[in-house]
Amino acid sequence: SSVLEIDSNPIALAASRKNLGLHFQNQNFSAEEFSQMKTDGFDALSKLESDNQRYDFVILDPPAFAKRKKQTKAALNAYTKLAQAGAKVTKKGGILFAASCSVHVQTANFYKAVFAGIHSAGRGYEEISRTGHAKDHPLTFREGEYLKGVFCKIT
């Protein structure tokens, strides 16, 4: 098995590599087992698709697309496009996980955007589960509900 991590932030990539070393101190991973790409996620997914790369498990966890309420519509369009790109590189029977930390994107609208993206990729899906805040992260106001995610089996 192998991991390909894509991030445009070099600090995030360095932290990930450091974390890998902390958890697997006695294991040296080859470039085939663990690799990183410092690039925009949309660009990377487009290239991977054109290179005919397909994966068993794809995680889409971008930074917040809507930091202001007026960015909500653009954010939903971006989540749809990201899910479409992710679905195109997920193998049939593979798992696609899409997440959002955008406070201004309502949970139901996020899920609709993800599902629309999967369909626009010409793929079907079976929803496995939805995620949100853990019990140790209590919600006392609607704006606090910003973490959301969905696992889908791509068909």
Locate each region found by the language model.
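Short, solvent-exposed loop/turn segments at secondary-structure boundaries
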Residues: S8, L48-E49, K70-A74, F141
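A structural alpha-helix within SAM-dependent methyltransferase catalytic domains
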Residues: E49, T80-A87, F115
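Mobile active-site "lid"/loop adjacent to the S-adenosyl-L-methionine
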Residues: K38, Y55-A85
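Conserved SAM-binding motif I beta-strand of class I
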Residues: S2-D7
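Flexible loop/turn segments at secondary-structure boundaries
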Residues: A12-L13, A44-L45, A66-R68, H104-T107, ...
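S-adenosyl-L-methionine
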Residues: I11-I59
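Helix-to-beta-strand junctions that scaffold the AdoMet/dcAdoMet cofactor pocket
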Residues: T90-K92
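C-terminal catalytic and target-recognition region of SAM-dependent MTase-like enzymes
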Residues: K81, I95-T155
